[in-house]
């Protein structure tokens, strides 16, 4: 509800006003600022720039004029907005690295791929329209489009331009409206024209038929489009998605040469990103980076590997994953349709709707020409009458006060015919020749018949449109720039893979303090420990391997050895790096390659085989690895040397069982299977436990020590202890039940 008070001020509720104002602003930005029209593929500011330049006579063959002159005309006549925004829109249409088919031909500094906004001010640059702008302008003035008043009502401007090709797909566009945006990628003119022709020949063709012609977007760069065909099809079906581009490179004399970057990637930014990683020592395999770009090679980035042993494919895959050498581009084909409503459209819908636009435009052009031809034929008919009665016509003109009315009455002429006769100069009237008039009449009559035939036949109209599309495509054609190549996904090299693998020893103390020493030739027990502390365990491995800690509850934790303090100190408590369950203590330290198989077991007699990678848990709380029966404890992990290894299990009751390791299940975690029978009640009250667990080859001997007693069991002696997994085993010789030490003697 609104009302006007006595002071002439309109009043309305604030809510109503704000809703109305926001809606009006939203519709204005969507319809008149940010989104392109499907017919000519231009946003209003772009259309006004192109039209203003054509009105200034700045076609492709004209002399260049100051850009400020064009911008002034655009702002003063059609687009009452900021000059910088208008000039920037003009610059984008002139940059060959921004527009696939630039509409403006610029002279001067119009920016560079490294910094598109480094263009000179409009008072310094000069411009004119490019040759390809003809596809938008050539049919103006032929009745093809409707005109509308400009912002102050003093001039008229076209509502849209009569595009002869689907420019909406050729150059694409980007824009941000209110509540919506548009990102339409550019395409190759040959492919789009061929697809349009195919749809004219076969209106029932589907998207798959179109995609046999249109490979995908074609950006103004020779970088590769690496999106799979299935993804590209989905984008063209739904009108939205993401396109991924990757730089092109080659090896040359041991160096890596990057010759093309993804669309809108800055060479200086890419170099800075790589240099930053080199400074942070994250690219030890790379020695140097150079920018060797020149006028012949706008993009030439040289990477120098540290040696010829560097895996260049892995290096580039890492750079693709971590720098702008690989970029993704949002696709959102949102535009104003022929129904003057914004909508996201698929490729097939865009092409079919543009062909409807083109049919309307060509029909209007032909009808406009037909009207002109009919008008001229009508005039010629009057001139022929004048020729046949030349003396009488001259007499009427000389002596009558109103010669026009007399001519119309005497010879039954129309108003237009009489005006045409009277407008002829006397010498032209005297020189009228029947042959000339007849020839022009015959020529125009043929044109009339042809125009009426085309306008009366949809097939002939489509044939004409097809011919014009093919001629224009041939005139402005150029090869595809962005090749479509399916590549493997870029993978970042982990820090551990890039760090040189050095031998390290990780030492754990009784009180849970940990440290890391370089090399394997140290004696962990001889190191200095805190008062009341002493050596508990250690593990040897490489600096690029994880170090795993196993606690008394059966949980495992992993840390990077390089994150541990040096062995020159007394270390740091593990409780500051790991979150152990209440009452739990770290029992063992393990290092191995990720695929190394290990035997995990509890002293209740259960065990299983797992890989070292199954022990790795990067979170501070670790992961549940071994499920322990009640009161059971974890045994030290054993390294499985080969698949034929034998498991030697010895209980505190003096029973020994030997069985193949391959009889144990391979698990990533769990309780495992029974290795040797220990009554559950005995295991629970810990009256009988698994005390010794070994892995040996089938040719190994065992030396048993108990106090001063020593017994050697050779392979043939061990045969009587071999049985199926889970059996009770056989009793060891007397005297080997307590304080037992065992040494494995491999052949």
UniProtKB/Swiss-Prot annotation:
Pfam families: DNA_gyraseA_C (PF03989), DNA_topoisoIV (PF00521). The active site is at 124 (o-(5'-phospho-dna)-tyrosine intermediate). It catalyses: ATP-dependent breakage, passage and rejoining of double-stranded DNA. GO terms for biological process: chromosome segregation; DNA topological change. Residues 35-498 form the Topo IIA-type catalytic domain. CDD domains: TOP4c. Its EC number is 5.6.2.2. It is a peripheral membrane protein. The record marks 123 as: Transition state stabilizer. InterPro entries: GyrA/parC_rep, Gyrase/topoIV_suA_C, Topo_IIA-like_dom_sf, Topo_IIA_A/C_ab, Topo_IIA_A_a_sf, Topo_IIA_dom_A, TopoIV_A_Gneg, Type_II_DNA_Topoisomerases. The record marks 43, 79, 81 as: Interaction with DNA. One of its GO terms (molecular function) is DNA topoisomerase type II (double strand cut, ATP-hydrolyzing) activity. It is an enzyme of class 5 (isomerase). It is found in: Cell membrane. Keywords: Cell membrane, DNA-binding, Isomerase, Membrane, Topoisomerase. GO terms for cellular component: chromosome; cytoplasm; DNA topoisomerase type II (double strand cut, ATP-hydrolyzing) complex; extrinsic component of plasma membrane. PANTHER family: DNA GYRASE/TOPOISOMERASE SUBUNIT A, DNA TOPOISOMERASE 4 SUBUNIT A. Heterotetramer composed of ParC and ParE. Topoisomerase IV is essential for chromosome segregation. It relaxes supercoiled DNA. Performs the decatenation events required during the replication of a circular DNA molecule. Belongs to the type II topoisomerase GyrA/ParC subunit family. ParC type 1 subfamily. This is DNA topoisomerase 4 subunit A. It comes from Haemophilus influenzae (strain ATCC 51907 / DSM 11121 / KW20 / Rd).
């Amino acid at each position: 509800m609104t009302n006007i008070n006595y002071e002439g001020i309109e009043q309305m509720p604030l809510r109503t006003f704000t809703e109305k104002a926001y809606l009006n602003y939203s519709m204005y930005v969507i319809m008149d600022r940010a989104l392109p029209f499907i017919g000519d593929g231009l946003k209003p500011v772009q259309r006004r720039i192109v039209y203003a330049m054509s009105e200034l006579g700045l076609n492709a063959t004209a002399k260049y004029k100051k850009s400020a002159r064009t911008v002034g005309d655009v702002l003063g006549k059609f687009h009452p907005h900021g000059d910088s925004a208008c000039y920037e829109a003009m610059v984008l249409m002139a940059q060959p690295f921004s527009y696939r088919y630039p509409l403006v031909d610029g002279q001067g500094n119009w920016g560079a791929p490294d910094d598109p906004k480094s263009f000179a001010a409009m008072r310094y640059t000069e411009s004119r329209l490019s040759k390809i702008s003809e596809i938008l302008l050539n049919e103006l003035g032929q009745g093809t489009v409707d005109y509308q008043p400009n912002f102050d009502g003093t001039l008229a401007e076209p509502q849209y331009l009569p595009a002869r090709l689907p420019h909406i797909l050729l150059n694409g566009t980007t824009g941000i409206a209110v509540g919506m945006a548009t990102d339409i990628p550019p395409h190759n003119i040959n492919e789009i024209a061929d697809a349009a022709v195919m749809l004219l020949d076969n209106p029932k063709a589907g998207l798959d038929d179109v995609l046999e012609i249109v490979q995908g977007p074609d950006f103004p760069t020779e970088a590769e489009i690496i999106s799979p065909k299935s993804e590209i099809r989905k984008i063209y079906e739904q009108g939205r998605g993401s396109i991924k581009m990757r730089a092109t490179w080659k090896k040359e004399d041991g160096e890596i040469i990057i010759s093309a970057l993804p669309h809108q990637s800055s060479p200086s930014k890419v170099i800075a990103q790589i240099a930053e990683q080199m400074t942070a020592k994250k690219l030890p395999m790379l020695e140097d980076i150079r920018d060797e770009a020149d006028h012949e090679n706008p993009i030439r980035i040289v990477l120098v590997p540290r040696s010829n042993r560097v895996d260049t494919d892995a290096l580039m895959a890492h750079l693709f994953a971590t720098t702008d050498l690989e970029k993704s581009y949002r696709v959102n084909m949102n535009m104003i349709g022929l129904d003057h409503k914004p909508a996201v459209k698929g490729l097939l819908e865009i092409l079919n709707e543009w062909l409807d636009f083109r049919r309307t435009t060509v029909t209007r052009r032909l009808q406009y020409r037909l009207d002109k031809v009919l008008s001229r034929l009508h005039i010629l008919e009057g001139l022929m009458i004048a020729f046949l009665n030349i003396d009488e016509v001259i007499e009427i003109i000389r002596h009558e006060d109103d010669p026009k009315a007399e001519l119309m009455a005497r010879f039954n002429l129309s108003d237009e015919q009489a005006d045409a006769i009277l407008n002829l100069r006397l010498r032209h009237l005297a020189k009228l020749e029947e042959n000339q008039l007849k020839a022009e009449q015959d020529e125009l009559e043929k044109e009339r018949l042809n125009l009426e035939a085309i306008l009366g036949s949809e097939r002939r109209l489509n044939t004409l449109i097809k011919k014009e599309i093919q001629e224009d495509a041939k005139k402005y054609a150029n090869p595809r720039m962005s090749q479509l190549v399916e590549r493997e996904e870029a993978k970042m090299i982990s820090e551990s893979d890039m760090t040189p693998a050095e031998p390290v020893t990780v030492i754990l103390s009784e009180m849970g303090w940990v440290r890391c020493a370089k090399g394997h030739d140290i004696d962990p027990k001889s190191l200095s420990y805190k008062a009341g502390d002493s050596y508990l365990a250690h593990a040897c491995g490489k600096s690029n391997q994880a170090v795993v800690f196993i606690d008394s509850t059966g949980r495992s934790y992993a840390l990077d050895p390089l994150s541990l303090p040096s062995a020159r100190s007394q270390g740091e408590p593990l409780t500051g790096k790991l979150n152990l369950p209440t009452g739990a203590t770290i029992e063992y330290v393990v290092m191995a390659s990720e695929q190394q198989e290990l035997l995990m077991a509890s002293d209740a007699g259960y065990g299983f085989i797992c890989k070292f990678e199954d022990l790795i848990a990067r979170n501070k709380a670790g992961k549940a690895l071994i499920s322990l029966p009640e009161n059971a404890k974890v045994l030290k992990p054993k390294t499985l040397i080969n698949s034929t290894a034998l498991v030697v299990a010895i209980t505190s009751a003096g029973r020994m069982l030997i069985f193949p390791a391959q009889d144990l299940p391979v698990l990533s975690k769990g309780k495992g299977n029974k290795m040797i029978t220990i009554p559950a009640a005995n295991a629970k009250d810990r009256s009988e436990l698994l005390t010794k667990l070994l892995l040996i080859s089938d040719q190994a001997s065992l030396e048993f020590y108990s106090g001063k007693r020593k017994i050697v069991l050779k392979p043939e002696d061990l045969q009587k202890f071999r049985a199926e997994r889970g059996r009770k085993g056989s009793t060891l010789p007397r005297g080997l039940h307590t304080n037992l030490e065992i040494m494995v003697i491999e052949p």
